[in-house]
Every structure is written in C-alpha cells, then in structure tokens.
C-alpha cells in the first residue's frame, strides 16, 4: 500500500517521482532514517548471543528520548513566551495549545510502559548484564525536563551522589544541566505571570481582602449553625471541625505562615502568585480567565502524568528485578525510584491543593462593574 501523502496512490505514476532539479529531499533523507534506523546496536548480538527482547528495549528507550526532545522543544518555546517583559495575552491560546501537546505526548509515554512489560523478567535477565553501567538515571533529557519544569535541586532524592555527577566528564551534558538550573523554570515564569493577575490590586478590586471577608462570613455562619445543634457531642465536633478549617485558611491569609511553608518545601508559589491562582479558579467563567484556567489545569495534568509515568516505571522495575537488587547504574533501583513518587517532585503542588481553599459559589465575592469590564475587555 502506498503512502497516502505521496501522490495519487499509483506506484507507477511518473509524477510521484521527484525530479532531479526539484528543491527538497525525499522521505528517508528528510527524516535522516539512515541514522535513526541504524542506531539499534544489540550488545548481545555483538557478543554472539543475540537476545530478541534487547531490540525492543533499545527501541522503546530511543522512542522515549525522541519524545523527551519534543517536550523540551515545547517547554523552551513556552518559557520564551512567558519570559517576555510584557506578556502578549494573545499568546495564551498558543501556550495552552503547546501545553496540551505535551500532555498528549506524556499520555503516549505512559502507554509505552505496557509494551516493555511484554518482556518477562527472565527475558530481561538474558541481556541485563550488558547494560551496566548504563542507567535511566543517566537520561540527560529527563533531567532537563525536570529542571525546566521547576524541580529544585534541594528537593531531589539523593542516592549515591549529586544527580549531575552521573554524566562524568561529558562537558556538553553538564553544561546543559547547569544552564537548565540557572534559567528561569516554567514554575518561576508561571509564578510571575500569576502575580500580575488583574483584580489583585489593593487600590482596585482587591480580591484578597474581599475573599478573606467572605471566608470569615462563611465560617461564622457555620459556627452559628453549629451552635444550634441540640446534641452536645455533635455540636462540639462541628465546632472543632470549623476551627480546623479556620486554621487552614489562616495558612494562606497569614503571609508569615505561608512563607514558612514555602521555606519548608510544602508550598512553591509566592503569596501573590497563590492569590492569583485562587482568583482565576473562582472566576474561570469570565472571558479573560478562561484560557488562564485551562493553562493551570494543563500544568496539573503534566505533573500528574509525569507522576503516573514514574509510578508505572517503578512497578515495571519491581516486576523485572524485584525490590532488593541494585540498578544497573549503581542506584538502589526500586527503592530509589519509589522515593521519587513523593510530592517533593510535584512541581505545581499548590495548584493541586487549591481545592482546599474553595468556598461555595454563593460565598464568592461578586465582581464590581469596573473589574468585570476589565475581565471582559483585554485591552482595558
């Protein structure tokens, strides 16, 4: 069957043959398939003991690395748009589109794990000896993805050494890693963007003050309702629960408490950025906040899918080598990988926790006419 993009489907059609003076390259030349398809070197075959499943192992990991490259390409373009001194809001749709593309790529990567699992532990053992000292820990591109997303060095789980030491004397890899640590991450750029959310101005709509007043009124109404509870034990339980909720809200209204949580690593956003994220969540139906809300949702999707990919990888490793063996690169294998599933690797943790601070729709501060016009007309 001929390629549907190569012409009218007639293999003997002379018009499908590129003329010698035409500009451009044929399919294989354009994609450099001679290099791509010749990059599968089975060490078991070189050792005159070919193991069939080593080919699958190589292909799958090469496919991962190609998709990692595309994710980095998308992240860099998004970071460039967000890093502008004045962000062009007409670019928001393009940012959303590219983030969605990353989400779809990550879904594909998650779905690739079951293909590797068609290989049994015994099949893997047949060629595992050829892999050392190679390790997935040495995937420079995955480290770049983590850094460009916003994983902090101090948040990383340490196993035997600093994560960049595995690249040894590879100057190019080390330089790329260093640059990714210095450059503003997606987390930092999104934080700056959220800090400029319209409606946070203290001399304007002052959303944060209005939100705090709404929370106080909401909780006071709950206290009043609890006091009318005829059963003393039930009343005390409700009052205790309300007080716990008041403490939770205090953690976002008290700047000092918030900063302490950031310092401890339990929060990532600045206080102002958290305010912006909460405001966008409440007023996401307003035209100006519709795409920003989609953007925040996609960032959570990316975090979720990376966590899911890590989890699937952990389970696969446990199935293949168990939980006690060392990884081929010298790490603790399963134990190390399992430790990366914690919230310390979740970059946009604050977005996941926004639901903690929601209040009923009827309690959300109503928009006044000036801010409503501002949120309808982007040019205001």
Curated annotation (Swiss-Prot):
User: What does this protein's record comment on cofactor binding?
Assistant: Binds 1 heme group per subunit.
The processes (GO biological process) annotated in the record are:
L-tryptophan catabolic process to acetyl-CoA; L-tryptophan catabolic process to kynurenine; ommochrome biosynthetic process; protein homotetramerization
- Tell me yes or no: is Oxidoreductase among this UniProt entry's keywords: yes
Instruction: Name the needed cofactors.
Output: heme
Source species, domain of life: Eukaryota
Q: What is its EC number?
A: 1.13.11.11
List the catalysed reactions. L-tryptophan + O2 = N-formyl-L-kynurenine
Give, as in the UniProt entry, the pathway in which the protein acts. Answer: Amino-acid degradation; L-tryptophan degradation via kynurenine pathway; L-kynurenine from L-tryptophan: step 1/2; Pigment biosynthesis; ommochrome biosynthesis
Which keywords does this Swiss-Prot/TrEMBL entry list?
A: Dioxygenase, Heme, Iron, Metal-binding, Oxidoreductase, Tryptophan catabolism
Q: GO molecular function of the protein, one example?
A: heme binding
Task: Write down the InterPro entries for this protein, in alphabetical order.
Answer: Trp/Indoleamine_2_3_dOase-like, Trp_2_3_dOase
| UniProt: substrate binding residues | 57-61, 128, 328
EC class, as a word, reads: oxidoreductase
Q: Does Metal-binding count among this protein's keywords?
A: yes
Read off the HAMAP family from this record.
T23O (MF_01972)
The UniProt function text for this chain reads:
Heme-dependent dioxygenase that catalyzes the oxidative cleavage of the L-tryptophan (L-Trp) pyrrole ring and converts L-tryptophan to N-formyl-L-kynurenine. Catalyzes the oxidative cleavage of the indole moiety.
PANTHER family, per database record? TRYPTOPHAN 2,3-DIOXYGENASE (PTHR10138:SF0)
Its family remark reads: Belongs to the tryptophan 2,3-dioxygenase family.
- Protein name as catalogued: Tryptophan 2,3-dioxygenase
Provenance organism: Drosophila willistoni (Fruit fly)
As recorded in Swiss-Prot or TrEMBL, the protein's gene is named v
């Amino acid at each position: 069957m001929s390629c549907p993009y190569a012409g009218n489907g007639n293999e003997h059609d002379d018009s499908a043959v590129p003329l010698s003076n035409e500009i451009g390259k044929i399919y294989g030349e354009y994609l450099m398939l001679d290099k791509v398809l010749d990059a599968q070197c089975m060490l078991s075959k070189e050792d005159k003991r070919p193991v069939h499943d080593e080919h699958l192992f190589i292909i799958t990991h090469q496919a991962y690395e190609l998709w990692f490259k595309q994710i980095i390409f998308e992240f860099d373009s998004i970071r460039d748009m967000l890093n502008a001194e004045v962000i062009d809001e007409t670019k928001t749709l393009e940012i959303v589109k590219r983030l969605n593309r990353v989400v779809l790529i990550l879904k594909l990567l998650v779905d690739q794990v079951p293909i590797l699992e068609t290989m049994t532990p015994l099949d893997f053992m047949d060629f595992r000896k050829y892999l050392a000292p190679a390790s997935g820990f040495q995937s420079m591109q995955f480290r770049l993805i983590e850094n460009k997303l916003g994983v902090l060095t101090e948040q990383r789980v340490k196993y035997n050494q600093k994560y960049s030491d595995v690249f040894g004397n590879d100057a190019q890899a080390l330089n790329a890693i260093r640059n990714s640590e210095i450059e503003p991450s997606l987390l930092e750029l999104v934080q700056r963007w959220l800090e400029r959310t319209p409606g946070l101005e203290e001399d304007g709509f002052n959303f944060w003050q209005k939100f705090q007043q709404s929370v106080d009124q909401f909780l006071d109404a709950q206290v009043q309702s609890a006091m009318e509870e005829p059963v003393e034990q039930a009343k005390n339980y409700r009052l205790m629960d309300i007080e716990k909720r008041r403490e939770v809200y205090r953690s976002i209204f008290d700047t000092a408490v918030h900063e302490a949580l950031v310092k401890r690593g339990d929060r990532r956003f600045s206080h102002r950025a958290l305010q912006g994220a909460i405001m966008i969540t409440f007023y996401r139906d307003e035209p100006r906040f519709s795409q920003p809300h989609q953007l925040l949702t996609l960032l959570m999707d990316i975090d979720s899918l990376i966590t899911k990919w890590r989890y699937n990888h952990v389970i696969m490793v446990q199935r293949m080598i168990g939980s006690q063996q060392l990884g081929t690169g010298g790490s603790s294998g399963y134990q190390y990988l399992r430790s990366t599933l914690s919230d310390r690797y979740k970059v946009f943790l604050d977005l996941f926790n926004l639901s903690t601070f929601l209040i009923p729709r009827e309690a959300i501060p109503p928009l006044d006419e000036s801010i409503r016009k501002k949120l309808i007309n982007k040019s205001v």
